[in-house]
Each structure stands twice: as C-alpha cells, then as structure tokens.
A protein has these predicted regions:
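A charged, aromatic-enriched C-terminal amphipathic alpha-helix characteristic of glycosyltransferases
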Residues: 336-371
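Conserved donor-binding/catalytic core segment of Leloir-type glycosyltransferases
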Residues: 7, 184-206, 212-215
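Nucleotide-activated donor-binding/catalytic signature segment of Leloir-type glycosyltransferases, i.e.
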Residues: 230, 237-258
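Donor nucleotide-sugar binding/catalytic pocket of nucleotide-sugar-dependent glycosyltransferases
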Residues: 134-183, 191
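Acidic donor-binding loop of glycosyltransferase active sites
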Residues: 266-279, 292-293
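Short hydrophobic beta-strand element within catalytic cores of glycosyltransferases
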Residues: 293-302, 317
Length: 374
C-alpha cells in the first residue's frame, strides 16, 4: 500500500471547508490531522473527519495562556516518514513552532497556510510572527494584499504564494444555470423595493446598525429599501429595536440562520446588493458566486482577506469605515442599475470567483507548491 508523503496539520475542519480538504485528499498523497475544535470558538460546526480520505489523527487543542495553545499529538507526526508538512500558519500554536523547526533540521519541507499579516500588527507581534513565518519553506496567503505585506516586511517574495479562499465552488458554479428571479422578497415585504442583504453571523462587530442607519438616510431622501439579515443572532444585537427606533420595522426581515444552498442562492441572486458593514470574509465569495455585488468598508487592515474579490464598480464597492452616510451614498449608486448593468455585474462576479476564489485554482497552487502533478 502506497504511503502518503504529505501531512496536513490543522486546528479544526469547519464544515464549510469540506470541499477544499476533500479536493486535497483527491489530488495529493496526503494525510490529515485535525483538532476537535478551535481554541477561540467551539461553536463552529466541523465536518465528519472520518469521511475524509487520509484522516489519521484527532488532535487536542489545549490552551496554554492567552491566545497561545498546543496541539497534543501533533509532534508525533515528526516520527513518521513524511516529506512535507502543510500546516495552519498560526504563530499562537506553540507546537507548530517545534514542528517547523524540527522539520528544517530533518530536511523536510514545510508549507504555511495562513492569513499572514493584516497591516495592523503591533511591533512585537510583527517580530514574533516574522520569525515564525521565516521557518517555513513556503507560505500560502489568502490574498495578494497579505503576501505583499509579508514581502515588504522582509519575507522572501519567492516563498510567498497566493492561495485564495473558497466555498463549494464546483457546486455553486453548477447551480448558476438554475438561478431565476423569484418573488421571495416581494411576497414577504409586499413591495418591490430594492433589497439590501446581509448574510453571516449577526454580531456587534459586524456593525449592522450602520446598515439600518444607511437605509434610514436613503428613506429620508426618498429612496425606500428592504433589509434582510440571514444568520444567527447569538449576541442579541437587537436589530428589531434599532429598526423600530427609525421607523423601519416593516422594512426588516430577520431571516435567521440558513444552511440550504438552494435557498441561499435564491436570496443572493434576487438581492440588489450584499452589504457587510463590518469586515467581510467568505460572505463576499458566497455572494459573488451567485452574481450579487458586495459593499463593505475600505479600511483594509481591519478586513478579512476576501475583501480583495470586491472590485470597485465591477463586483461591488467600498465605503468609509463606520460612516453610515457614506454607506448610503455608495448603496445609492447600485440601486439605479439597469437590468443590463446587473447582468454585467453578475458576469464580472462569476469571472472573479472562477478566476481565483475557487477550489480548482487552489488545488493548482497546492500542486505547484507541493510539487505533485498526479
């Protein structure tokens, strides 16, 4: 029986990342070790590790102090004859330091899969993380922005590669031919006003109050919009109360959590624009996958890496962070688009996702970096 030569060590396997891990298993000679949950949040559902070909070990993520943690069982992978290690690039994981250092002594390749730098890191954090990244043979960052920051900070450009990020891109691509305009919003609201959609966790940090305030500003200037919030409100943010205070209680739909891909596709496709007033992450990829433009803030050091798939005027736009009036101004630009313009936006959105933010392009990068062509 052929022995796999690559070991992937990761903190956990969130359910939405099943497509990329399954594609790795299908395309590379790779074993997987996952933690049962993340140190920072235990609320994220993981996929069934037992269904992933190559899954070999369940690790235990043990908090040491602050954000630092240790993955019990990870070091044992050094005793096996792996030639390459694909690892979550998180400097807070102390066991990863040991593995990266030991692998270097053993002349084994290490590949760091990481967010990299955001641009807001403090001096000491920068120094520590730079030392961490320097130990790896290759670095995979989610976007060009982070890779450029690492290169400017002294990490050799030759070892930095952009990997992008993805959801279930193959499935989403196949679903596009079935997308249709429906009455999902008009039947709920009883009107045909434009729809501003938010999809993600309903949290204080997402600044959804700005979305309601922007809608109020638009209304005062004679433009009515409907607001739809898709996601679980575990922090009791109080969106209904916010809407009631400005007289928009009949213009808000708290849809709640939704994990049905067909329903989400319908919601995105029929919305006028997806708005993420706080940082945006994979929501941007999700929205663009179904042709829906994305609006988010312009302070990139406080953004998720997926902000990079927002191309101003093409696939979405940016507004001044924390500025509801500017958010209203940017939203207004998109409300007047003709059917032809919306069609062009959808084409641009699909091109952006199909070019970089998908499983196939990620696998191409993995194969190149890990030097496997099978």
């Amino acid at each position: 029986m052929k022995r796999n030569t690559i070991c992937c060590i990761y903190n956990s396997g969130p359910h939405y990342r099943w497509p990329i891990f399954k594609a790795l298993a299908d395309n590379l000679d790779i074993d997987f070790c996952f933690g049962s949950n993340t140190v920072y949040t235990k609320s994220i559902k993981t996929f069934d590790y037992g269904k992933l070909p190559g899954f070999t070990r369940l690790l235990r993520n043990r908090r040491i102090f602050g954000k630092f943690y240790w993955q019990s069982g990870a070091l044992r992978q050094l005793l096996k004859p792996y030639r390459q290690y694909l690892m979550l690039g998180e400097a807070y994981c102390l066991s990863s330091w040991i593995i990266a250092f030991a692998a270097k002594l053993l002349h084994r390749k290490t590949v760091c899969w990481t967010h990299g730098w955001y641009g807001r890191e403090s001096g000491i954090k920068r120094i520590i993380s730079k030392r961490f990244y320097s130990m790896f043979s290759e670095i995979l960052t989610y976007n060009d922005y982070s890779g450029n920051l690492l290169a400017e900070g002294g990490i050799p450009r030759s070892k930095i590669h952009t990997i992008g990020n993805s959801l279930d891109s193959r499935k989403h691509r196949a679903m596009r031919s079935e997308l249709r305009s429906t009455d999902i919003y008009s039947s709920h609201f009883g009107n045909t006003d434009p729809v501003l959609l938010y999809c993600g966790r309903v949290q204080q940090s997402k600044r959804l109050d700005l979305m309601i305030e922007a809608a109020h500003i638009l209304q005062e200037h004679g433009t009515n919009v409907n607001l739809v919030f898709v996601g679980a409100d575990n922090e009791h943010v109080g969106l209904e109360d916010m809407a009631r205070r400005v007289g928009l209680q009949n213009k808000v739909w708290l849809f709640g959590p939704c994990y049905d891909d067909n329903k989400l596709a319908e919601l995105f496709y029929n919305a006028t624009v997806c708005v993420s007033p706080g940082n945006v992450g994979l929501t941007a990829v999700h929205a663009l996958s179904f042709g829906c433009p994305v609006i988010t803030h312009n302070n990139f050091p406080f953004q998720g890496p997926e902000f990079e798939c927002v191309r101003p005027g093409l696939t979405g736009d940016f507004f001044r962070q924390n500025d509801a009036a500017d958010l209203a101004r940017v939203i207004a630009k998109w409300l007047g688009h003709t059917a032809r313009q919306r069609e062009e936006t959808a084409k641009a959105a699909y091109a952006e996702i199909d070019g970089k933010w998908n499983v196939d392009s990620q696998i191409s990068v993995f194969k190149s970096v890990l030097k496997q062509k099978n």
